[in-house]
Amino acid sequence: KLIEADQRHKKFGSSRFVIEPNVKEGKGGIRDIQTLIWISKFAYNSKNIFHLLESGVFLKKELYILSNSYKFLLSTRCYLHLLSKRENDNLDIESQIEISKLIRFRQKEFQRPVERFMKRYYIAAKNIGSLTRIFFSVIEDNFKKSIRFNFFFRNRINLEKPFIFKRKKIAIEEKSYILNKPEIIIEIFHISHFKNLEIHPETLRLLSDCSKLIRKKQVISKRSNKLFLEIISSDKNPRQILRLMNDTNVLGNFIPDFKKVIGLIQHDMYHHYTVDEHTFFAISNAYELKNE
């Protein structure tokens, strides 16, 4: 099922932030939730996603977010079918404008109703993408054959407290470390980027939960700013780690102005993705030019 999901994402667009997304088959779409439900039935014998609370896979707050995001995508798809008078899952620009009117999104400051509707859509898709990533990582951890931790691997890379290895992935030992020193939120992304280490799903959840802390304290942390600048100016393409920082809500809290462009669309012939996704592509292209 995971291989099928990867193939589907490649077919319908590897980014969930395309201007005209496929509501059902696209990344962060309805099919991703259905895949999660199918796998959970096999792995945990659950009847619906709310049974995953008992299994300890999701927190109550996460299931609430997942359920609301799923409902929003389902209602969007229903409106799309009604407008098209046929089965149609491609949320094109004309349909976006019409659906935003039907749902009665209003003008807010400089945001048009369609921009507000699509921002809500992209946030729902981002929530689904982030939470299904956690689910699939937990499944992988729980059901893969237990492999003895490679002693050579562990000694090749030295980690200092509060960072530890958990199934060959970097993790933070306890939440209290973040509460006392929020700058380690940026530090773990820095380590992940430069040492090619995946971040453990439980830690991704923790980072998302604590992301607002850096909004309050990052101004006085010169080290956080320094680490972030090292990431975006490094000899390794930073697009992937920046996306992960965005998915965990860290980037928008670390750079408050960036939060305003997350999920923001521009309906013109030059933009095929949301503004935040175009920003990641621009940084990636700058890296490619620098290394030609």
Please place each PLM-identified region on the residue numbering.
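Non-catalytic interface/linker regions that flank or bridge core catalytic/transmembrane domains
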Residues: K1-H271
